[in-house]
Amino acid sequence: EGSIKMLDAYARVFPVKDLNFTIGQMRVPFTIDAHRSPHQQYFANRSFIAKQVGNVRDVGFTGCYTQKEGLPFILEGGLFNGSGLTNQKEWHKTLNYSIKAQLLPNKNWNLTLSTQMIKPEHTRINMYDAGIYYQNNRFHIEAEYLYKMYGHEAFKDVHAVNSFVNYDLPLKKVFNKISFLARYDMMTDHSNGLADSETGVLKINDYARHRVTGGITLSLSKAFIADLRLNFEKYFYQKSGVPKESERDKIVIEFMTRF
């Protein structure tokens, strides 16, 4: 909070049609919602999959192939150094990897399967994600599930779900459209994979919770160019849960512009 970080800095080349390679600092190709850029998000506050459980940016190398004929699909994969955004001086014996496949049976449907392995410190973490969405001129309906497991049972497995619906209503004056949104997402107790400095074991960084979000988005131009987002978030914790100040019931107003 109150800090500015450079999130993406990469070079991308297209050696042949439908194939590209990227090297630099970028968002790791994993999941649907966590792989969205900030201007592509539907809600003012990201889902638990995108913000806590599956959010990874790193320095590395990726390749992406797109097939447009027959059964269209997009296949991405990459290797990463595992040090995150600002700590790339250390040498590592283990490379992190991520693989993501998007199946596009027609223009309205997207089925995404992805897997990722990271090793933040001494514990190997494997993640598996499956998501699907349907989209037409008015509706976007999406559901996603992420499963996260820790090596040597260093921490109990994590489950996370994100589901939402968005309906667009075109407008003729002032705003281009108004969008009505509703979301349900949840996560179980989560650890970022870094051991406690005193006990040496993994600790809970994010306590289990459920959340219901409702909101509207006013678009001043085409979608995801200039949006005014207004959301209300209702959280549900277990009695043992300790919510962070920023992870409680709240109203969020956000103005997003892309230039």
Residues covered by each model-derived region:
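Outer membrane beta-barrel
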Residues: E1-G82, K93-L95, Q102-N110, F164-N166, ...
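Outer-membrane beta-barrel pore domains
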Residues: Y10-R12, T22, A34-R36, L111-F259
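A broad detector of the eukaryotic-type serine/threonine protein kinase catalytic domain
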Residues: G82-G84, K148
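Active-site cleft segment of glycoside hydrolase catalytic domains centered on the general acid/base Glu
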Residues: N87-H92
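Short, hydrophobic/aromatic alpha-helical segments in well-folded domains
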Residues: Y97-K100, Y128
